[in-house]
Structures are given as structure tokens and as C-alpha cells.
């Protein structure tokens, strides 16, 4: 038996996702964060943006975007960051940190939710449970 595969993305989804990431990047840079990596990929997943805030905290950012009509039908962009997605992001962050040896900085997971024209920045949106 094969593991279930994610549904294919609708046409234009990659361009929409890239535009949302561009918008999120500009939004966060305007608020003092600096980009460390973009679209970090590893065997366990992908992190849209890896940034550092003014206090030196390493920030792993998941960008979620929904057009207004799908947000009404299926919930907002933030609702699409499921516990399974959170686990994949945490695993990818662990991989990122393993590839950057040295003292582990303070880290957090933020979500940028874009619903139509609205941007919501959820700092420390979820954490790693011990």
C-alpha cells in the first residue's frame, strides 16, 4: 500500500504562493527582520522564510495565503497550518539548525496569514513540545 500523496496544486498556485512569500518578506523586512534563507528545503519539509529579528531570534516563517472566497468556504489561511504541517516545519527547522553548527540561538515559529488583502502576523504561532 502506498502512502497517501498530497493533492496536486491548482494551476497558478506556485505563482500565487511565490507572490504571497514576496509580500510576507517585504512586510517582515519593513518591521526590522532580516532574511537568512528563503524556501529552505530538506527531506523532512520546507520552510518558506528563515529570518532573524532585531533581538537576534531565529524566526522560521510559514506563509499561508487564501483568496477571499476560499477563505470564506474553508477557513482563513491560518487554519491551514495543521498539526501535521507544524510537525513538518519543526523537523525542517531541526534540519536547518543541524546544518548550521554552533550555539543554538533562540528560535520561534511565526505564521504570516494572507487572506485576500489582509495580512496577519502571528508571532510564536506554535512551539515544540518536550
Swiss-Prot record:
Family statement drawn from the similarity comment of this UniProt entry: Belongs to the UPF0102 family.
SUPFAM superfamilies: Restriction endonuclease-like
Residues spanning the signal sequence: none
Name of the protein: UPF0102 protein RSc3265
Species, as recorded: Ralstonia nicotianae (strain ATCC BAA-1114 / GMI1000) (Ralstonia solanacearum)
Pfam short name (any one): UPF0102
Disulfide linkage: none
GO molecular function: nucleic acid binding
Coiled-coil stretches: none
UniProt superkingdom: Bacteria
